[in-house]
């Protein structure tokens, strides 16, 4: 039985078979955890779905791990700042409502 996608096709997308296994496992775990798929799949199993994504080029190994970490840190920092801004707005709204209540009494 011929497996699709073929190992030869997949090895054109990644530097080594070891990298392929790691990339497939990580992506399969992401799919199992509920990550959004990048395409529609022929396969039912998440491991084969990951291989389909690798074959299509939708999932790749990041060429610069330091840049990837920096991008993740920047995203986390942006999310933190957005949360802080939201909390500040809520506190201002609460203070404004308390002030309005004090004027009514």
UniProtKB/Swiss-Prot annotation:
Residues in coiled coil: none
Gene3D superfamilies hit by this protein: 3.90.940.10
Gene Ontology annotations for the cellular component aspect, listed alphabetically: DNA-directed RNA polymerase complex
Record keywords: DNA-directed RNA polymerase, Nucleotidyltransferase, Transcription, Transferase
One Pfam family per UniProt: RNA_pol_Rpb6
Membrane-spanning parts: none
Gene Ontology terms for molecular function: DNA binding; DNA-directed RNA polymerase activity
Database matches in NCBIfam families: rpoZ (TIGR00690)
Subunit structure: The RNAP catalytic core consists of 2 alpha, 1 beta, 1 beta' and 1 omega subunit. When a sigma factor is associated with the core the holoenzyme is formed, which can initiate transcription.
Protein name stated in the entry: DNA-directed RNA polymerase subunit omega
Organism for this UniProt entry: Streptococcus equi subsp. equi (strain 4047)
Gene behind the chain: rpoZ
């Amino acid at each position: 039985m011929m497996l699709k996608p073929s190992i030869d096709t997949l090895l054109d997308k990644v530097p080594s078979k070891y990298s392929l296994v790691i990339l497939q496992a990580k992506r399969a775990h992401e799919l199992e955890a509920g990550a959004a798929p990048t395409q529609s799949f022929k396969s039912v199993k998440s491991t084969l779905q990951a291989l389909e994504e690798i074959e299509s080029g939708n999932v790749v190994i990041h060429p610069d791990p330091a840049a990837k970490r920096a991008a993740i840190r920047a995203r986390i920092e942006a999310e933190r700042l957005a949360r802080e801004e939201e909390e500040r707005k809520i506190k201002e709204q609460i203070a404004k409502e308390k002030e309005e209540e004090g004027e009514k009494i």
